From Swiss-Prot:
<dbReference type="GO" id="GO:0004017">
    <property type="term" value="F:adenylate kinase activity"/>
</dbReference>
<feature type="binding site">
    <location>
        <begin position="85"/>
        <end position="88"/>
    </location>
    <ligand>
        <name>AMP</name>
    </ligand>
</feature>
<keyword id="KW-0808">Transferase</keyword>
<feature type="region of interest" description="NMP">
    <location>
        <begin position="30"/>
        <end position="59"/>
    </location>
</feature>
<dbReference type="InterPro" id="IPR033690">
    <property type="entry name" value="Adenylat_kinase_CS"/>
</dbReference>
<feature type="binding site">
    <location>
        <position position="31"/>
    </location>
    <ligand>
        <name>AMP</name>
    </ligand>
</feature>
<comment type="subunit">
    <text>Monomer.</text>
</comment>
<feature type="binding site">
    <location>
        <position position="92"/>
    </location>
    <ligand>
        <name>AMP</name>
    </ligand>
</feature>
<feature type="binding site">
    <location>
        <position position="133"/>
    </location>
    <ligand>
        <name>AMP</name>
    </ligand>
</feature>
<dbReference type="GO" id="GO:0044209">
    <property type="term" value="P:AMP salvage"/>
</dbReference>
<dbReference type="InterPro" id="IPR000850">
    <property type="entry name" value="Adenylat/UMP-CMP_kin"/>
</dbReference>
<keyword id="KW-0545">Nucleotide biosynthesis</keyword>
<comment type="function">
    <text>Catalyzes the reversible transfer of the terminal phosphate group between ATP and AMP. Plays an important role in cellular energy homeostasis and in adenine nucleotide metabolism.</text>
</comment>
<feature type="binding site">
    <location>
        <begin position="57"/>
        <end position="59"/>
    </location>
    <ligand>
        <name>AMP</name>
    </ligand>
</feature>
<protein>
    <recommendedName>
        <fullName>Adenylate kinase</fullName>
        <ecNumber>2.7.4.3</ecNumber>
    </recommendedName>
</protein>
<comment type="pathway">
    <text>Purine metabolism; AMP biosynthesis via salvage pathway; AMP from ADP: step 1/1.</text>
</comment>
<feature type="binding site">
    <location>
        <begin position="10"/>
        <end position="15"/>
    </location>
    <ligand>
        <name>ATP</name>
    </ligand>
</feature>
Length: 189
């Protein structure tokens, strides 16, 4: 099974993906984690990515798609992938569909975690205070949220038209959201 966890920064995608990895043995393909690993490597690509993220901008499709494609064999071996933070644009979604189709696979479900903006700001402020991630500082977060809203909004109709989109209340407790995800996936499986 291949699924996409969709939602704004701080919606809880990473938390839920980690739970699904533990319970279902799937591989989490988090573009955020992959980009942070590239930065930590100190490579030329990592330095380029750092500059983009520090400004709160989105990394180019080419870079993100290459990172994802490199990890697909691992997901296939595990029996499925959880795409966290990808795709963010319709061209990325189309590229993902094409990548999976070449492997005889598809996206089975898209789960959107809906969270109100004030709650996102509260969550990101707490995470910034606890973890100090540069892309979580309040000024950069506002830019990230605006980019998310502007660039990812067209994905909703893209997946809704395919009958793959399920919208879930991301404002609920971690456990309640987990139950909603399990219920949504039981219909697909």
């Amino acid at each position: 099974m291949n699924l996409i966890l969709f939602g704004p920064p701080a919606a809880g995608k990473g938390t839920q993906a980690k739970r699904l990895v533990e319970q279902r043995g799937m591989v989490q393909l988090s573009t955020g984690d992959m980009l942070r690993a590239a930065i930590a490597s100190g490579s030329e690509l990592g330095q380029k990515v750092k500059g983009v993220l520090d400004r709160g901008e989105l990394v180019t499709d080419e870079i993100v798609i290459a990172l994802i494609e490199d990890r697909l064999p691992e997901a296939e071996a595990a029996g499925g992938a959880i795409f966290d933070g990808f795709p963010r644009t319709v061209p990325q979604a189309q590229a993902l569909d094409a990548m999976l189709a070449r492997r005889g696979q598809k996206i089975d479900s898209v789960l959107r975690l809906k969270v109100d903006e004030p709650a996102l700001i509260e969550r990101i402020s707490k995470r910034f205070a606890e973890q100090g991630r540069p892309d979580d500082n309040p000024e950069v977060f506002v830019t990230r949220l605006a980019a998310y809203n502007a660039q990812t909004a067209p994905l909703l109709p893209y997946y809704r038209e395919q009958g793959k989109l399920t919208e879930l209340d991301g404002m609920a407790s971690v456990e309640t959201v987990a139950g909603s995800i399990d219920a949504a996936l039981s219909v697909v499986a």
